[in-house]
């Protein structure tokens, strides 16, 4: 009886592979991927809070919070990290608010950044789908979900009711995107705003626009909020920002990270290194003084940060000790089979797009409307 069941199962598996291709179904133990492949967020503290050393490839991440809390800054740091590793990044700027000068200060190579400023929500999501399907994009940022306005709303009159239109649009788009993202190992970062529910007496009245689909499809959801201002004398030079991992499917959720976002500079690497090194006693804190080895590096946190900024060799040494202490060098490694699968998906996407380009007319595709930021004149 057991042999008959096994034979029937083997027949079914062969039939599935014949109809849908090799790899359509397999036993989990046969998969060679044992670790989650990640891209660093650009912040050591956030990488630690995420639990796997960064954003997982092939997944959807939502970053939401109040206005001017640092959501775009967090996303741009991820873009910079992808580009440092030789990857390709795309940015769907639905808010038409991306500052290329600020992005460049954060380490983004604006000449290679693919930028699209769509007219409607449908156009923006079609462009996103075309870019992800190509298999040649490593990270895609959509800024923001709230600004993806449906075509019917744009073409309609002010005051017209369009109940649930954006939610249906997002639900349909995410159904298509989620599978493609997993195959091409592309990270999709969706930036979102917050709204308040009317008439809520108990519980949190805050919610995010775009319906519930993004909440379900997102592997990671990050809540970004300003905690306090950073001052130098009477001048405000930045904000202390708290990032809470509200949802995490690849590691324990509800961890928090605190980072300094300095105006014009982005996330302060030295600030988080001081905090994390002090937590692991790599840098000793006695009263208000910070010391490393036999040397005092500053009285107060800001002076310790200045010392590390002025001594990059010391900062590099401490950073490596912090990474070792938090076990970050051991996470996010890819197996060779995973590399091959991602490469195969990219090659298939490129070949598919190439053949389409030869057979079709010169009509522009949605992906062709996404331009290199370097192709546009930038005022500095």
Swiss-Prot record:
Subcellular location(s) per record: Cytoplasm
Biased composition (Polar residues): 352-364
PROSITE patterns, alphabetized: RECA_1, RECA_2, RECA_3
InterPro entries, per database record: AAA+_ATPase, DNA_recomb/repair_RecA, DNA_recomb/repair_RecA_CS, P-loop_NTPase, RecA-like_C, RecA-like_N, RecA_ATP-bd, RecA_C_sf
Binding residues for ATP: 65-72
Superkingdom classification of source: Bacteria
Any single biological process term in GO: DNA recombination
Recorded family membership: Belongs to the RecA family.
Described function: Can catalyze the hydrolysis of ATP in the presence of single-stranded DNA, the ATP-dependent uptake of single-stranded DNA by duplex DNA, and the ATP-dependent hybridization of homologous single-stranded DNAs. It interacts with LexA causing its activation and leading to its autocatalytic cleavage.
Protein name: Protein RecA
Lineage: Bacteria, Bacillati, Bacillota, Bacilli, Lactobacillales
Gene name in the database record: recA
């Amino acid at each position: 009886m057991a042999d008959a069941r096994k034979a029937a199962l083997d027949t079914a598996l062969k039939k599935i592979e014949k109809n849908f291709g090799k790899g359509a179904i397999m036993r989990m133990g046969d998969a060679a991927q044992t670790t989650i492949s990640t891209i660093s967020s650009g912040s050591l503290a956030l990488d630690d809070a995420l639990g796997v050393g960064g954003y997982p490839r092939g997944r959807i991440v939502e970053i939401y919070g109040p206005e001017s809390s640092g959501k775009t800054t967090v996303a741009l740091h991820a873009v910079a990290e992808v580009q440092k590793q030789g990857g390709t990044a795309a940015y769907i700027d639905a808010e038409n608010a991306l500052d290329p000068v600020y992005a460049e200060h954060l380490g983004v190579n604006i000449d290679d950044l693919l930028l699209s400023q769509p007219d409607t929500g449908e156009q923006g999501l079609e462009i996103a789908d075309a870019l992800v399907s190509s298999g040649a994009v490593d990270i895609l940022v959509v800024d923001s979900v709230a600004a993806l306005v449906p075509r019917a709303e744009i073409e309609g009159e002010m005051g017209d009711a369009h109940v649930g239109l954006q939610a249906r649009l997002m639900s349909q788009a995410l159904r298509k995107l989620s599978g493609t993202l997993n195959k091409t190992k592309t990270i999709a970062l969706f930036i979102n705003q917050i709204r308040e529910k009317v008439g809520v007496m108990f519980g949190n009245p805050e919610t995010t626009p775009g319906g519930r689909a993004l909440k379900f499809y997102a592997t990671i959801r990050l809540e970004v909020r300003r905690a306090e201002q950073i001052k130098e004398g009477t001048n405000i030079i930045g904000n202390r920002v708290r990032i809470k991992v509200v949802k995490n499917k690849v590691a324990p959720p509800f961890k928090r990270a605190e980072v300094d976002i300095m105006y014009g500079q982005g996330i302060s690497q030295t600030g988080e290194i001081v905090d994390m090194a002090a937590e692991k006693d790599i840098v000793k804190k006695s009263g208000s003084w910070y010391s490393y080895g036999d040397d005092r590096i500053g009285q107060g946190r800001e002076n310790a940060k200045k010392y590390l900024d002025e001594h990059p060799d010391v900062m590099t040494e401490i950073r490596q000790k912090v990474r070792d202490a938090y076990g970050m060098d051991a996470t996010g490694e890819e197996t060779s089979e995973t590399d091959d699968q991602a490469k195969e998906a990219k090659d298939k996407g490129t070949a598919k797009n190439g053949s389409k380009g030869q057979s079709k007319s010169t009509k522009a595709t949605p992906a062709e409307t996404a331009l290199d930021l370097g192709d546009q004149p930038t005022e500095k």
